[in-house]
Structures are given as C-alpha cells and as structure tokens.
C-alpha cells in the first residue's frame, strides 16, 4: 500500500540460497506402506510441488530415478520441518542423509556454505564447546563474558555443524543456547576431517 500520488516499489527481499540437500524417496523398506497413506512417487511429487508454492527457500529437482527427488533447503531445521509436516499429513517417504551444497567460484574453486554461530553458555562449559567447534573447523570471531556466561561467536562450515545441536545440548547440560544463520559461501579448505 502506498500513496497513489507517489507510488514507490518496495525493496526486493533477499532469499538465502539453499545450503543443504536431501533426497526424498519412495519408501522401499520391508515395512513400506504401514506408516502413511500417501506412498507413491506421484504423491510425493505433488506434495513437493504444493510446498514450492509457499516455501520460497526450497528447491526441488528431479533425479535420474523416478522414485527420488533432490530437495534443497536453507539448513537442517528447514528440511526437517518439511519432512515432519509431510509425515503428519500421511506421507510415507525415505530420506537420505543431508549433503552440503558445494558451489564453484568464478575462478573454478570449490566453495562451501559457512554459518555464523552465536553461543551463550555457562563459563564452566565454554572450554568443551570451544574445543568441539575448533575440531569442526570453526573460526572464533569474538568471545566475551558476563555474569558467569560466555558469549562465543564463530564462523563454522555447515558440514561441520551437521548433527552438532544434540552434542551441544549434552555438553552444556541444556543450559546453553545456540543461534545459527547463513554467513557466506567461502573457499573450501582441504579439511581432512570436520568432526
């Protein structure tokens, strides 16, 4: 809505690029058909097409197999919410483990997504958290402390954060908080192990 005498377009909203992908497949396990009523690839395809109409951060691609779709999203939470919603709606599907989306830069080098991670944790657990994030190839950007809590800010490759939330909750006995958001695609460093 705007003044008819002075119509001004709204600024375009920047949508972050997908950083993780998973394959959504027809369930072919021995227990197939027992957990849902929508079990065919046609059902899965139609549901994903419906999701694309409202979920602007999602990307769905066909694969070589007619029973599988490559679904890309903005992180573990984004994709897990979609999976859980589909299961609650009666869709039965199998999913692959998440894979980080790798891009090529202008010079042809591999680029990987890096996330900005902000952590608030009691001082007694900060050493463990710092150690684990360093092993996951995180780079500390800032550290501060106040009233017995440490605030840690890191840049960590997305592949280093896969599965880390549960470990973080266990390490901090549920007393820490962690916020993540996409930072940038940065040059892939030849890291032997991220975890």
Region locations from a protein language model:
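Accessory interaction regions appended to the cores of large information-processing enzymes
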Residues: 1-195
């Amino acid at each position: 809505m705007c003044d008819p005498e002075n119509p001004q377009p709204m600024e375009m909203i920047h949508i972050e690029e997908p950083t993780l992908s998973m394959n959504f497949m027809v369930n072919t396990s021995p227990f197939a058909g027992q957990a849902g009523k929508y079990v065919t690839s046609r059902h899965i395809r139609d549901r994903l097409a419906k999701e694309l109409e409202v979920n602007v951060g999602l990307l769905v691609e066909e694969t070589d197999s007619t029973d599988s779709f490559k679904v890309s999203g903005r992180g573990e939470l984004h994709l897990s919410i979609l999976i859980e919603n589909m299961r609650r709606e009666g869709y039965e599907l199998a999913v692959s483990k998440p894979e980080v989306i790798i891009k090529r830069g202008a010079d042809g080098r591999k680029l990987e997504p890096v996330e900005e991670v902000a952590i608030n944790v009691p001082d007694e657990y900060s050493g463990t958290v710092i150690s684990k994030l360093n092993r996951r190839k995180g780079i500390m950007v800032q550290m501060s402390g106040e009233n017995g809590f440490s605030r840690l800010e890191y840049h960590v490759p997305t592949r280093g954060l896969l599965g880390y939330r549960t470990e973080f909750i266990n390490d901090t006995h549920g007393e820490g908080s962690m916020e993540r958001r996409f930072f940038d695609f940065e040059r892939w460093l030849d890291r032997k192990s991220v975890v």
